[in-house]
A protein has these predicted regions:
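Feature captures hydrophobic
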Residues: 1-145
Length: 145
């Protein structure tokens, strides 16, 4: 059954994935993920009992966002907020590097760090969990398109 709130965001995410322009990727991904957690019981169940705070940013801080998980909900800020202390901070060279890392079938975090595409400060398991959620959302987007 179509969802009037989530489906347009999933289509926008799919358009980001199909284009070469990665700039809006982080914003679209986080917005779609937050809505999916609200309206989809399976997505909500995947974060049940999970508490985590993520900060994503570029080194120049021109692109940044914060995602907070808690109480089976997710909230998003479209800026990097370092207080209170995040569980993981991901500094990425550019939005394309972040997109490639998060949406890879087998995320090679160590390889991305060695290539200096990303720098991770905090618990790497949080990033792997986020990548899993992003891949799940990508699959939802391909089904919606």
């Amino acid at each position: 059954m179509p969802n009037l709130v989530l489906d347009p965001l999933l289509k926008k995410l799919q358009a980001c994935l199909e284009s070469d322009v990665a700039e809006p990727f982080l914003t679209v991904l986080l917005d779609a993920m937050a809505v999916a957690m609200l309206v989809d019981a399976k997505c909500r169940a995947s974060i049940h009992g999970f508490e985590g705070r993520y900060v994503f940013k570029t080194p120049d801080k021109k692109v940044g966002a914060t995602a907070v998980f808690g109480g089976s909900h997710m909230s998003v800020s479209h800026q990097a907020i370092d207080r209170p202390e995040p569980n993981v901070t991901v500094t990425f060279r550019n939005p394309k590097a972040l997109m490639e890392l998060l949406l890879s079938r087998t995320p090679d975090l160590i390889g991305a760090m060695l290539k200096q595409d990303v720098n991770v400060d905090g618990n790497l398991n949080y990033l792997y969990r986020f990548a899993f959620l992003a891949r799940h959302l990508q699959l939802m987007a391909t089904r919606c398109a």
